[in-house]
Amino acid sequence: MKYGLCAVDLDGTLLGPTGAAHEADVVALKKLLARGVPVTIVTGRLYSGTRHVAEQLGLRGPVACVDGSHIVSTETHKTLHCHALAGERAIALRDAMAASRAATFVFAQDQVVYDERGTAYLGYVSTWSTSLVATGDSVSHPYWEEDAGVTAVVAVGDRTQIHAAVEAIAKTLGDHAQVAMFPAKNVDERWGMIVRAAGGDKGTALAYVADHYGVPMSEVVAIGDWINDLPMLRVAGRSFAMGHAPEPVRKVVTDRLDHTSLEGGGVARAVELAFGVRAK
């Protein structure tokens, strides 16, 4: 099989724990580009947290951010597609977050808006973007009422606060929102939550990018490591899971890598196996 597009996740896949890409993986992707094979990024990060990696690789084309909710051109830095919560749905989400009193981070217009309650968690949230904007009260920021809506909302709080928010969102937004609740990494005894508009994920975003390049999904290669990568790993013709990926991810892929993001080299190995391009 000849493959025509390579899609790579960032954190935990191309990027290591420090947020930097490993040299061998960068070299492999650049060699792939030099052969005329398009490469794209499909990440949970905002574009502001993705752009420097795209520039490091020399990407020219669409990249998918916020788990597929925001697709941006790396050439113009303009939005190609945005799947946001707007209007009454954004207001309903805002009200649910206000009632929960959890630290609320609003992802909108390629920024993360936070208030005093979120200051302690900036290190955690900066994984998505370092374009952080302080405000007096994040749940009363004008972004909630703008036509563009909000791309996503992340919240951090105790389990009771987050559970209350999840229940309120389910009651008021129902199938219009997708919600994930989880123990917050590196934040002791705190829970996290991310909310996005339903209907968009890494799989739909990858289909958009593949269509942009005129590549059938059967000829797309995807590389990821985490649960949010499942939608793109399921739809790609060939899919790779990093060595540290949890079993639900490893179950759905065509290939399981031994490499982890700690030592790097997983992306380079996937590129070699799928495209015959070696980093060295």
How would you name each of these model-derived features?
Residues 2-18, 93, 233:
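Asp-based phosphoryl-transfer active-site loop
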